[in-house]
Amino acid sequence: MRDMRASSPETTSAVKCPFNKTAVEGTHNKDWWPNQLRVDLLHQHSNKSNPLGETFDYAKVFQKLDYAALKRDLHALMTDSQDWWPADFGHYGGLFIRMAWHSAGTYRIGDGRGGAGRGQQRFAPLNSWPDNVSLDKARRLLWPIKKKYGQQISWADLIVLAGNVALESMGFKTFGFAGGRVDTWEPDQDVYWGREMTWLGGDVRYGAVSEGVHHPDEHSGAKEKASKNSDSRVLENPLAAVQMGLIYVNPEGPDGRPDPLASARDIRETFARMAMNDEETVALIAGGHTFGKTHGAAPADNVGPEPEAGELEQQGLGWHNRFGSGKAGDTITSGLEVTWTKTPTQWSNDFFEHLFGYEWELTKSPAGAYQWVAKDAAATIPHAHDPSKKLLPMMLTSDLALRFDPVYEKISRHFHAHPDQFADAFARAWFKLTHRDMGPRVRYLGPEVPAEELIWQDPVPKVSHVLVDAQDLLALKHKISASGLGISQLVSTAWASASTFRGSDKRGGANGGRLCLAPQNQWEVNQPQQLSVVLETLRRVQTEFNAQAGDKRISLADLIVLAGGVGVEQAAKRVGIVVEVPFVPGRTDALQEQTDVSSFAPLEPFADGFRNYVKGDEVVPSEHLLIDRAQLLTLTAPEMTVLIGGLRVLGANVGGVKHGVFTDRLGTLSNDFFINLLDMGTEWAPVSKERHVFEGRDRRTGVLKWTGTRVDLVFGSNALLRALAEVYAAVDAQEKFVRDFVAAWSKVMHLDRFDLV
């Protein structure tokens, strides 16, 4: 929901440090060089910030949880109204549903970031977003339960479970619940929320559409522009919210303009970017708005700063409300004042009854926000804190989108006529919403994990054969070595398979062998023509091995990874170092019908610096995109560095381009990349004004020696990365380089093997 009180994400006063020459004040590197490469993003969430220590195993501790007792306590909490924050209608269900929704709803499919999986709603900026007003109170209401069960339930799990129990306590049958979300202890720094410097601004993500929304009485020129261009405006990737500080859309309409059809376009775009189709979108909006209410008792100037800007005595709570009692019937959250149904604490079909049962006319809330009131309607809606009062039916602009958009209307009318199908659709969509970033089912914990396998979970078959042993692996390695495939082909294919993994939502990776399926087998970065040759060859090896007597088998997914390891071992042997690349069998091959092509499309890399690849124009400097990809692969800066150096000399570049191949021993796992990059006998210069590709010439003769991209040269330019490159360029570094490369390579190959944890 929209909050209209904060204009910019700033604190109310500067912090003054009484001591001189401390780290609290002073100018920092980011102040001098705001565009500096964020290598620090690769070192987030270290054990130094984790009070539980590196040996803490949440999955093991969760198994000790008295889950039934926890749910009983949550059920009791729903109607245990507290004087310091009274429950609407005597039931906290609506508040906890909103808390869980807004925790999960930050997820976006573009990069897999956001979502409920880390408990990030506790930290800035999410704890202070305008859309999250009053959720600080929801988490405080949960604290006694979190305190009671301690580390047996994470905040991340508890927030979602509270939403589930809220639904159940109001008569709704949920689809299930899975635990397994592990808390982090500091804000995520890698999530791009947009570049706007004003809360509720959309001027950057839509290209100068809105400068922010601050409770206007009249439409501004920017809003008129937004409305006129609402058909064609394009939301910046990977964002999935229309304004800074919102979860999805502005409930008043695009940039505050009360236009249901324009709102529908925003809804469709933002929900699609969270991997929801039209039916799921309607089910979520209608199902969620069956419960609870919005809050806009008075204008926004009654509300104080958000939690991160609050004073010490507020103890992490924000948005202190000076209107009336500041709570209950005087609450100000979104500025809107809407209760959707006659039974806001019971599951019903009332939302659709009202949506289609009335005609609607524009009005304003007591806070001045645009909303809609039913024409010629009786006052049938209960007051949240005064049983003697009844209110007129109200709707949001974003609600009316479900009636006036033709596609949404058809779905809504179907759900109206078939309430059982509506309930099932909402249950499934809610489960998807709250579990989308958890990765494969093998990570799910608890007694309420649903048995049904869902396509969006990227299912892979269970292992149904005897796995290969050490002797088999030796025989298979020999077959691969004799297959005629080169080191470059073996390495680049394995990398293409495994490097789709995203630590954000735990999707991608080598398990499932989806490199062989659409859409991955047609991605430009995977060199489809070469890929088909490699896969055909490996299939012959697989077929021959699996034709043996007995139940022993190897999957193509396993064979691709094993073959990559063979390439690495061969390349290491060329520098006189014998290594065994770790390999653990157990991957299986998914079927095409187990693969949602549209859902996998966002995993296609726009840029992969590890393969010196950029698709189309470089909008963002490629070295920054490298950091982004390395972070998704959960790599540290040293791991990223050693992988770049190794993949270059192994010939993993897309299309066989020579940029960054600083060696005359291609296919040899040497440290030549670093030696030649740091050679002061080479002088570098851009080949064009775009500065994407550079030439390295002999400083004395001018003879061309090498070409490199921004990704290559950053390892000599950036001070932090150069320090790492110097380690691997040293005379005594060859063996360390090989062993570090093998370790980093093995990490990437096994990132999705949650079955091994």
From Swiss-Prot:
GO function terms (MF aspect): catalase activity; heme binding; metal ion binding
Stored InterPro entries: Catalase_peroxidase, Haem_peroxidase, Haem_peroxidase_sf, Peroxidases_AS, Peroxidases_heam-ligand_BS
Posttranslational mods: Formation of the three residue Trp-Tyr-Met cross-link is important for the catalase, but not the peroxidase activity of the enzyme.
Keyword Iron: yes
GO CC, alphabetical: cytosol
Biological process according to GO: cellular response to hydrogen peroxide; hydrogen peroxide catabolic process
Cofactor: heme b
Region (Disordered): 210-231, 293-312
Record: residues binding heme b: 289
UniProt remark on cofactor binding: Binds 1 heme b (iron(II)-protoporphyrin IX) group per dimer.
Top-level taxon of origin: Bacteria
Keywords: Heme, Hydrogen peroxide, Iron, Metal-binding, Oxidoreductase, Peroxidase
Ranges of compositional bias, category Basic and acidic residues: 212-231
Residues marked Transition state stabilizer (site): 98
Catalytic activity annotation: H2O2 + AH2 = A + 2 H2O; 2 H2O2 = O2 + 2 H2O
Main enzyme class: oxidoreductase
Transmembrane spans: none
Signal peptide extent: none
Positions annotated as active site in the UniProt record: 102 (proton acceptor)
Family per record: Belongs to the peroxidase family. Peroxidase/catalase subfamily.
Subunit structure comment from the entry: Homodimer or homotetramer.
Function statement: Bifunctional enzyme with both catalase and broad-spectrum peroxidase activity.
Protein name as annotated: Catalase-peroxidase
Annotated organism of origin: Xylella fastidiosa (strain M12)
Gene that produces this protein: katG
